[in-house]
From Swiss-Prot:
Domain of life: Eukaryota
PANTHER family in the record: ATP-BINDING CASSETTE SUB-FAMILY F MEMBER 1, ATP-BINDING TRANSPORT PROTEIN-RELATED
GO molecular function terms listed in the Swiss-Prot or TrEMBL record: ATP binding; ATP hydrolysis activity
GO cellular component, as recorded: cytosol
Residue sites binding ATP per the record: 636-643, 956-963
Bias (Low complexity): 121-143, 153-166, 182-195
Basic and acidic residues: compositionally biased ranges: 314-328
Protein name in the entry: ABC transporter F family member 4
Length: 1142
């Protein structure tokens, strides 16, 4: 019967107020809700009560929303249908209406519904006997319906009785369509009886819920008689289903409806994946007509979507009413989504009663072990919400279709206890309920009181049931959030790494393009050499990348472990002995950590080291040990790998060095800023700075909390006494005096070190500041590369004296033999891709080397004589009777390793052309005074002279004017007063350390000479360059590709081109190795002209100087009466007098 006041197909807006106003109306015209439960006849039989218990056995698997009770008048419920957007609309039969019976043949139509009734059990009337089945047909139909009920739990009305199953076969279709539609029963309402043979239009909805689990009522007699023989076959078929369906937690299991057979089975495939929540309604809903049901079923045929039920959403807050047009549009949009939802594994299994339904329940539970079903929590508080929330819930459900929400497996014992409690309470309520109207009024009043309570409150029963479930769900949500946040961080890291890789690839492509352009200009030989260099570069880059990755991984692992350790410590509930405590930094040497350092060791050792640069290998399987406290001198020819190896040690690259060892490598000058040299040096000692800061912290803690040592948060693995001892050991109170002495020893004045800013110094002086910082820190390993290059003679002598007292590991790369003789006690000689170590200073090394060379020459001669005899025997007897012996000796000759002597390097040649002789004097200074304009006079009344046989060394502290005097000699500057007499035929050549930087590096040496000297013949240029070691293919190479020493040779060759009578050499040894310096000394001694030398290289001065001219600060020059070594000893005495005592 249609609703009053509403035409067919018409929809009305609904609201909570209208529903409340409609209570107490006539029951006959009441419209169906979206989820209308099947009425059940009220009886006193206990078998129906068992069915009710079965519906509560699985409350976590299928939530059931319950609608508010109201006394609706006839025709008023249709207005509410327009706002309800519920996907599931079960259809009841009219109360008291007799459906038209449909005949059924024996063994006939039940075959059509076999596949559709896989999982739907049939309820039995409470207190009544099960309906008998017709012969030949009804037995099989009942089995098919049982198959479909294995995954569809069916709730039972609260306080109501299960609906009976009428005779006849028309019930089959309704059961088929209840596969996925749980049907609740109204609380306390009277069930409407079903007539025999009545049609059920609800079959479409039931067919669409093919995979929702249905609990089965226990104890029905009819269940025992149902087809037991087919159970095993049905179980095998049901195990093949693999579609996961999420189910709300806390919802009560739906109850299958009963009714006659309908004709609409086409919607089974369409709604195979749709899960439909069902409301519980009052008993007035039972009177709704079947015509409106048919209209709603036609709308539901379009639904093909899995509708997950949101966790924690209200299941009972949907109001009664039919569907509106907007619901249909949303359903059409949702049909496109086909996302599988996770279903909870392992639902609660209870002991099943005997009978067919018990077997069906057992089969459905077996299949649940493969399907994880999230279950929704709920309570009575959910009943308040109305149809306005339906749209929000559907949107949330659509979002949840993209997210699988696994739920933990519930324990059987916990669920059993909670379900038994709930069933016992329900059974008590059902006994108290009667058939009269006063029962309905009492139930309505109870429901209204529950609606007035705040939503935050739930009934005690739900609290008891869901307490542990809620805790589990909160833990699960936190666990799900944690991996998401971690994955987001990993994604960010991966994204940043990917960007860096793309940038590197772009840079490589740009480099390749540039190289291709350069290759077009290069010859074949140069291209091949460049390709070899590229290969080596690629290998090195790969090694660097791998090293960076390893370092990053180690740092990340260390930081994570450290953070984890800090997070895990609960300082409030932990014993202080269990706290790891804070350690001092590795560069701080406290007594508390000396034991650990002694176990680790302070030596540096490496084996089988391979060192290479683009284009060639420097070291191959080299081994070396640097013992702590020893001082090593590193010698070898330029470009052989000395500086490269020192940098490798400083970077700890492929070389094992204990972490507590501080390694300092003085390579670059300090950056100029507003700090003074003294402050810059004091700030370099990190250990002293940390000790002073920690002393302040601990003394402050002592004042605030005298018992801080017992606070786990403040625990330290060292004491304040340890800090005091270390500060005393390093003379922290005398740090300023020590820093000042170092600066003064390196050439600074006491007045300027605390006033002048570092930015006001030149590069050479800032390099001295960097050296002073390293010496002040006193690292365990000090690495120096050509420390005397930027120092004057006085500073070199001071540095020698300072390093003589060095008690830690020292490795010095130096080309000054005198410095090595004074400082080191071991020599490491690099040659032929290997390292040889010698005990003693540089002179001892040279003696041992010469002895080894003579011994090797003798062995070489002996081997050559032996090989010559063997070769003569082979040649003589290869064709006679001793041919076999000759062949045997030939094989022996091939196995003999020939001894090879070190070849003399052709570049170790400096040959100045000899000038014609000129009568003296060539250059004479007579009462010469000089000073720059606006400055004080630098030189006063100079009376000096230079001839062709002069070999003079100018010495003095930096800044006294040695280079200025040399410019006056060359004529670059002119005297202020006095007179400089020069011979007219005299030619003078001056070498400056800055000339190397002024070379045109885009030219080859041959092109440079052609531009300087009016295009002389190429062969003449090559011959002249060969006299200074620029031979073979070097004259054809660009100057930019030459080493610093080779560039210096080009300058010397340029000076010698004019065949000068006097050579003025200002620091010519920079960039020259020891062998080249020796060659330069030999060339200068063989030169027949005059030589004036300015050099910090004591060995060169000692080899060539016949006169020592000392330039003093007062602008005078005097001839030192002794030798250079006598002058050096005098400098040493002066340095001792310069030391600040306090």
């Amino acid at each position: 019967m249609g609703p009053k006041g509403k035409k067919k197909g018409q929809s009305f807006d609904d609201s909570d107020e209208e529903i409340n106003n409609k209570k107490g109306g006539n029951k006959k015209g009441q419209q169906l809700e979206d989820d209308i439960p099947q009425p059940v006849k009220k009886g006193g039989n206990k078998k129906g009560q068992r069915g009710k218990q079965d519906s509560d056995d699985e409350p976590e698997n299928i939530p059931q929303p319950v609608a508010k009770k109201s006394n609706n008048k006839k025709g008023q419920r249709g207005k509410q249908d327009s706002d309800d957007e519920q996907d599931e609309i079960p259809q009841p039969q009219k109360k008291g209406g007799k459906p038209a019976p449909q005949p059924q043949k024996k063994g006939g139509k039940q075959q059509d519904s076999d596949d559709e009734q896989d999982e739907i059990p049939q309820p039995v009337k409470k207190g009544g006997k099960p309906a008998p089945q017709k012969k030949g047909g009804k037995q099989q139909q009942q089995q098919d319906s049982d198959d479909e009920q294995e995954e569809i739990p069916q709730p039972v009305k609260k306080g109501g009785k299960p609906a009976p199953q009428k005779k006849g076969g028309k019930q089959q279709d309704s059961d088929d369509e209840e596969d996925e539609i749980p049907q609740p029963v109204k609380k306390g309402g009277k069930p409407a009886p079903q007539k025999k043979g009545g049609k059920q239009q609800e079959s479409e909805d039931e067919d669409e819920e093919d995979e929702v689990q249905q609990p089965v009522k226990k104890g029905g007699k009819n269940d025992k008689k149902k087809g037991v023989k087919h159970v095993e076959e049905e179980e095998e078929e049901e195990e093949e289903e693999e579609i996961e369906q999420p189910v709300k937690k806390g919802g009560k299991a739906p109850k299958p409806k009963k009714g006659g057979k309908g004709s609409k089975q086409e919607s089974e495939d369409e709604e195979d994946d749709v899960q439909q929540p069902v409301k519980k309604g009052g008993k007035k809903d039972k009177k709704k007509g079947s015509k409106h049901v048919e209209e709603e079923e036609e709308e539901e045929e379009e639904e093909e979507i899995e509708q997950p039920v949101k966790k924690g959403s209200n299941k009972k807050d949907q109001k009664k009413g039919g569907k509106g047009k907007h619901v249909e549009e949303e359903e059409e949009e949702e049909e496109e989504e086909e996302i599988e939802q996770p279903v909870k594994k392992g639902s609660n299994k209870k002991d099943q009663k005997k009978g067919g339904k018990g077997k069906q329940q057992q089969e459905s539970e077996d299949e649940e072990e493969e399907i994880q079903q999230p279950v929704k929590k709920g309570g009575k508080k959910d009943k308040k919400k109305g149809s306005k929330h339906v749209e929000e819930e559907e949107e949330e459900e659509e979002e949840e279709e993209e997210i699988e929400q696994p739920v933990k497996k519930g324990g059987k014992k916990d669920k059993k206890s909670s379900l038994e409690d709930s069933m016992s309470e329900l059974s008590i309520k059902s006994k108290k309920g009667g058939k009269g109207k006063h029962v309905e009024e009492e139930e309505e009043q109870e429901q209204e009181e529950e609606e007035e309570k705040p939503k935050s409150k739930s009934n005690k029963k739900d609290k008891k049931k869901g307490k542990h479930v809620e805790e589990e769900e909160e833990e699960e949500e936190e666990e799900e959030e944690k991996p998401k946040s971690k994955s987001n961080k990993k994604d960010k890291k991966k994204g940043s790494k990917h960007i860096e890789e793309e940038e590197e690839e772009e840079e490589e492509e740009e480099e390749e393009e540039k190289e291709e352009e350069e290759e077009k200009k290069m010859t074949l030989a140069e291209i091949r050499a460049a390709k070899k260099v590229k290969k080596v570069d690629k290998k090195e880059k790969k090694k660097e990348k791998e090293k960076k990755k390893r370092d990053e991984q180690e740092e990340d692992a260390f930081e994570l472990a450290k953070k984890k350790q800090q997070e895990e410590i609960d300082y409030d509930n932990i014993d202080i002995d269990d706290v790891p405590g804070k350690d001092a930094p590795t560069y701080v040497h406290l007594k508390s950590s000396e034991g650990l350092r002694s176990k680790i060791g302070n030596d540096i050792k490496f084996d089988n080291l391979i060192l290479s640069v683009p284009g060639r290998i420097l070291l191959n399987n080299a081994s070396l040990t640097l013992a702590y406290g020893q001082k090593y001198g590193f010698v070898g020819r330029n470009g052989i790998g000395k500086s490269t190896l020192v940098k490798k040690i400083a970077m700890r690259d492929e070389i094992t060095i204990a972490p507590h060892l501080r390694v300092l490598y003085v390579e670059q000058e300090v950056t100029g800023d507003d700090t003074t040299p003294l402050d810059c040096v004091l700030a370099a000692d990190e250990e002293r700075k940390w000790l002073l800061d920690e002393e302040k912290v601990l003394t402050e803690l002592e004042k605030v909390n005298p018992s801080w040592q017992f606070d786990p948060r403040q625990k330290r693995n060292y004491s304040l006494r340890d800090i005091y001892d270390r500060l005393k050991e390093i003379d922290a109170d005398k740090a300023s005096i020590r820093a000042a002495n170092i600066l003064i020893g390196l050439g600074f004045t006491f007045e300027e070190i605390s006033v002048k800013k570092s930015r006001d110094y030149s590069g050479g002086w800032r390099m001295r500041i960097a050296l002073a910082r390293a010496l002040f820190c006193k690292p365990e390993v000090l690495l120096l590369d050509e420390p005397s290059n930027h120092l004057d003679l006085h500073a070199c002598v001071w540095l020698e004296k300072y390093l003589n007292q060095w008690d830690r590991t020292l490795l010095v790369v130096s080309h000054e033999a005198s410095f090595l003789n004074e400082v080191v006690d071991n020599i490491i000689y690099i040659h032929d891709q290997k390292l040889d170590q010698y005990r003693g200073n540089y002179d001892a090394f040279m003696k041992q080397k010469s002895v080894n060379l003579r011994s090797k020459e003798k062995e070489k001669d002996k081997q050559d004589r032996k090989l010559k005899k063997m070769n003569e025997f082979i040649t003589k007897n290869k064709n006679n009777t001793q041919a076999k012996q000759a062949a045997s000796r030939a094989k022996k000759m091939e196995k003999i390793e020939t001894i090879e002597l070190e070849r003399e390097d052709a570049s170790l040649v400096v040959d100045f052309p000899q000038p014609e002789h000129l009568t003296p004097p060539l250059l004479v200074f007579k009462d010469v005074c000089f000073g720059y304009e606006g400055r004080p006079t630098m030189f006063k009344k100079l009376d000096i002279g230079i001839d062709m046989d002069s070999k003079i060394a100018l010495v003095g502290m930096n800044g006294v004017g040695k280079s200025t005097l040399m410019k006056l000699m060359n004529g670059d500057l002119h005297e202020t007063t006095g007179y400089i007499e020069r011979s007219r035929k005299m030619r003078v050549a001056r070498f400056s350390q800055h000339f190397v930087d002024q070379l045109d590096t885009t030219m080859t040496p041959i092109e440079y000479f052609q531009s300087k000297f009016n295009n002389p013949p190429v062969q003449q240029i090559r011959n002249h360059l060969g006299r200074f070691g620029i031979c073979n293919s070097l004259p054809l190479h660009k100057i930019t590709t030459l080493s610093g020493g080779q560039k210096s040779r080009v300058i010397l060759a340029e000076l010698a081109w004019a065949e000068p009578h006097i050579l003025l050499l200002d620091e010519p040894t920079n960039h020259l190795d020891i062998d080249a310096i020796e060659a330069l000394a030999e060339g200068i001694n063989a030169f027949t002209g005059g030589v004036v030398l300015i050099s910090h290289n004591q060995h060169l001065i000692n080899l060539i100087a016949e006169q020592i001219w000392v330039v003093k600060k007062d602008g005078t020059i005097y001839l030192y009466p002794g030798t250079f070594m006598d002058y050096k000893n005098e400098i040493s005495r002066e340095i001792d007098n310069m030391v600040i005592r306090s």
